[in-house]
UniProtKB/Swiss-Prot annotation:
Binding-site residues for NADP(+), renumbered to this chain: 48
Textual note on the cofactor: Reduced FMN (FMNH(2)).
Protein name as it appears in the record: Chorismate synthase
GO cellular component, one term: cytosol
């Protein structure tokens, strides 16, 4: 099975299955000299882990991370960083009825069609459980980018037909983690929670969307044609299970705008740098960053694991039969996907920062003395 690695310079390679022994990720390309400990990773994993509230799965995973390579005396060494998160609360027995009877709208049939077999416990590799690895890797990327003044943030801006009004970046930083829905507009968050409860009571689920934004990203990142920043970021977001759309700037609303309205005149900022007068393009022009905030929206369909009675077929007996998907599942995805979106945004931006030479890929220039003293007292000075 290919397709388990993301990134060119900052490479994230993952393994693990929903009900296997553990999830794991190897990060190659992290520069030496980054101060890093498990607590840095754990803080982000705790935001994503299950069992946080009544609107998340009740699966009781602590998601405790163990760093087993690439870090010495609290600093990265420049070698691959290995991280393992054990699965502590897997219960595969409830999935036995689906071994030969695919659950509607899951990856059960397609994985079997491709590989001739599949790990049926909890959906195996197709499960969103796998995103725990991405958040672990994203925590490292986030820590590096923070040192360069780059900050990514996301919040849930729509659940079903309930949409939040626009909020500022500062409001996202302040309010997103204040409620279970992770919506930065408190009043809308309450209405969203009520709607989720309504569907959950009916044994159903609901979709939604996440607004994301990154600030401090320099101009000039991206490699057109097929490796532009929006293309790669789109790949990152579409890799998140259940993602149905990704858009930047005006997104689908751009079809209603005349060119004379959407086009933005150029002007100079207070430092004398050329800058568009607006940012309807989401910080991206020609597939390359403009230096303005990158922003957009990603949408998720409703979770497919629901207890409502549905129809399937048993390819072993040749019969059509009723099916009810039992187990512990999320009634809505965006609240737990917020840290996943932030992780993929951070990973993608860091990869381009390394590719374009904005960050030294071998060692962090901001703190070379610490690395020299702690690790290699006889090594040459940083150029």
């Amino acid at each position: 099975m290919n397709g388990n690695r993301f990134g060119r310079m900052f490479q994230v390679t993952t393994y693990g299955e929903s009900h296997g022994d553990a999830m794991g990720v190897t990060v190659s390309g992290c520069p030496a000299g980054l101060e890093l400990e498990e607590a840095d990773i754990q803080a982000e994993l705790d935001r994503r882990k299950p069992g946080q509230s009544m609107i998340t799965t009740s699966r009781g995973e602590p998601d405790a991370v163990e760093i087993n390579s690439g870090v010495q005396d609290g600093y990265t060494t420049g070698t691959p960083i290995g991280m393992v998160i054990e699965n502590k609360d897997a219960r595969s027995g409830k999935y036995e009825p689906y071994v030969t009877a695919p659950r509607p709208s899951h990856g059960d049939f397609t994985y079997s069609a491709k590989f001739g077999t599949r790990n049926w416990g909890g959906g195996g590799r197709s499960s969103a459980r796998e995103t725990v690895n991405w958040v672990a890797a994203g925590a490292i990327a986030q820590k590096i980018l923070t040192e360069y003044g780059i900050k990514a943030k996301a919040h849930v801006n729509q659940i079903g037909d309930i949409k939040a009004p626009p909020v500022t970046f500062e409001e996202m930083l302040e309010h997103t983690e204040e409620n279970e829905v992770r919506c930065a507009h408190p009043e809308t968050a309450e209405r969203m929670r009520e709607r989720i409860d309504e569907y959950q009571t009916e044994g159903d689920s609901i979709g939604g969307s996440i607004y994301f934004e990154a600030r401090g990203v320099p101009a000039g990142l991206g490699a057109p044609r097929f490796d532009s920043l929006p293309a790669r970021l789109g790949k990152a977001m579409f890799s998140v299970p259940a993602t149905t759309s990704v858009e930047y700037g005006l997104g689908h609303e751009a079809r209603e705008w005349r060119g004379s309205n959407r086009n933005e005149d150029w002007e100079f900022d207070e430092d004398g740098n050329p800058i568009p007068e607006g940012n309807t393009h989401g910080g991206l022009q020609g597939g390359i960053t403009t230096g303005q905030p990158i922003y957009g929206e990603a949408t998720w369909h409703a979770p497919t694991s629901i207890p409502k009675e549905q129809q399937t077929v048993d390819w072993e007996t040749g019969e059509q039969k009723d099916i009810q998907v039992v187990g512990r599942h999320d009634p809505v995805l965006p609240p737990r996907a917020v840290p996943v979106v932030e992780a993929m945004l951070n990973i993608t931006i860091l990869d381009f920062m390394l590719l374009d030479g904005q960050i030294n890929p071998d060692r962090l220039d901001d703190n070379p003395g610490q690395y020299e003293t702690e690790y290699h007292p006889s090594s040459p000075q940083t150029n």
